[in-house]
Structure formats: structure tokens, C-alpha cells
């Protein structure tokens, strides 16, 4: 019984330890809870609007935010992982500046290429389709 009680008392310490070194980043486009320890987002919140434009992602690459410790493009030179958007640029393509902001490293998590270009892309496309169906 004492071990169970100790476990229950310590569980929140372990469960929320990752939040100690996390930063809440609010922008007009999305909100990110970013872990500087893991150098990736823990979660991202954004609104999915019906597509009203099609900004070109040509020439865009991920970039760092000076106020937060993140990985950078050099970390991915010889890496097998894709830099995957958490708030997808396809959902934020109504304006070039908005889409550019989706390329912050704080909005990126390393993903296996097959995941990023496979089921994750299908999920992003499906969410956009649902927004169009519901006219949101």
C-alpha cells in the first residue's frame, strides 16, 4: 500500500517533468508548447480554415527562432528524417507570410519519410477536406 501511495504521489512529477523546460509560444497563426530539451513541439494548436489561396512553398526552408533553443537545418544534413510540419503549411497557405511562419523550427518534428509523405500527409489532406465540407 505504501509503495502504491508513493507511486501515485510521484506520478505527476514524472508525467509533467517534460513541461519544466518547455516554452509556450503564441503567434497569430498557431500556438506551440515547445520542449527545449527534446527540441521539438509537444503539441501545436491552430485553426483550419477553408483554403482561400495557394501561396507557393518554393524556396522556403525551415528557420530558427532566436528566443528558443531549437535544432536547425544543419542537424538534418546527413539525417534520414524529414522535417515534418505540425501545423501544416498546406493549412496556412492563404498568405505567403503566414505560410513562411509555418516553417519555424518550433513547428517541426522529425518524421520518418514514409510517415511524413504517407499517412501524415493523408491526415493533413483529410482535415482540409473536412474543413471545406463544413465550410470552416
What are these regions (language model features)?
Residues 3-14:
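Sec-dependent N-terminal signal peptides
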Residues 1-2, 56:
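Short, intrinsically disordered low-complexity segments
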Residues 15-136:
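Domain-level detector for secreted/extracellular nuclease and nuclease-toxin modules, and
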Amino acid at each position: 500500500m505504501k509503495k502504491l501511495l508513493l507511486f501515485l504521489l510521484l506520478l505527476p512529477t514524472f508525467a509533467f517533468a517534460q513541461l519544466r523546460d518547455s516554452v509556450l509560444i503564441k503567434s497569430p497563426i498557431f500556438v506551440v508548447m515547445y520542449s527545449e530539451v527534446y527540441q521539438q513541439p509537444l503539441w501545436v494548436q491552430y485553426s483550419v480554415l477553408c483554403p482561400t489561396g495557394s501561396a507557393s512553398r518554393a524556396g522556403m526552408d525551415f528557420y530558427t527562432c532566436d528566443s528558443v533553443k531549437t535544432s536547425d537545418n544543419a542537424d538534418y544534413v546527413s539525417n534520414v528524417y524529414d522535417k515534418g510540419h505540425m501545423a501544416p503549411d498546406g493549412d496556412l497557405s492563404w498568405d505567403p507570410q503566414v505560410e513562411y511562419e509555418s516553417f519555424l523550427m518550433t513547428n517541426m518534428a522529425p518524421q520518418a519519410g514514409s510517415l511524413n509523405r504517407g499517412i501524415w500527409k493523408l491526415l493533413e489532406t483529410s482535415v482540409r477536406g473536412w474543413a471545406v465540407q463544413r465550410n470552416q
